[in-house]
Amino acid sequence: MVPARAELFGSVCSSWNFIRDKSTNCRAYLCHMYTAELIFEHFPELTPKQKEQFERLGPLYEEWNAKINVISRKDMESFYLKHVLHSLGIAKVYDFLPGQVVLDVGTGGGFPGIPLAILFPDTEFHLVDSIGKKIKVVNAVAEALGLENVEGSHVRAEELKYQYDFIVSRAVTHMQRFIPWIKGKLAKKNFDDKRPNGLLYLKGGDLAEELGPLKAQLTHLNQFFSDEFFETKKVVYLTRKEIQGFHAPKVKS
């Protein structure tokens, strides 16, 4: 039984495990998976304001996606799982601090930047993409949610003149092609003595060949999220030092 979209992004179910019989468990599981309840389960310390913002994400993207295709129609059916929760996987690896400035490269419609900005309201997020219509959606969603810590810019990462404490991204391209885009974009002085400035990159699959000589810290997301979607999903952490010292070989297109 697959619920209609109106049901998927309608009022959020108060609980997904309230009845035990098979049919209602199926319906309750779908409700849980397709709404912000999925986020509330994994991040129980959310404030009422943050919960409201996460609840509004689904309808906002459903509305914008009808005008500008920033997320595949198929993926909208599992929006909170494949886009919101996946983005928040970075938060299972690192808690951004108040005052830090984070760059989201190739943000598309706002991922992972928008969900992270909701979770860390005292951290500044600069979301960039080379496609202007996607940034239009980013800024509209941020404004609708009252996210004053988000700025979206229609620009390529290579063209940026600023430096950041962290860079985040989600499977934009081959890692060894990505690294040259962000060289020089990380501040030399660490904001957090416990975690050197660097890149937090969401990526799936076998990364041994792709990472090559890069000394990366890999965190498997299936230790936090049980859905099979996360079976091969990871957060790749690279320090600024590792990024600055990397010389990319030629990568096939």
Which residues does each predicted region cover?
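Class I SAM-dependent transferase core
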Residues: L30-P98, K133-K136, A140-E148
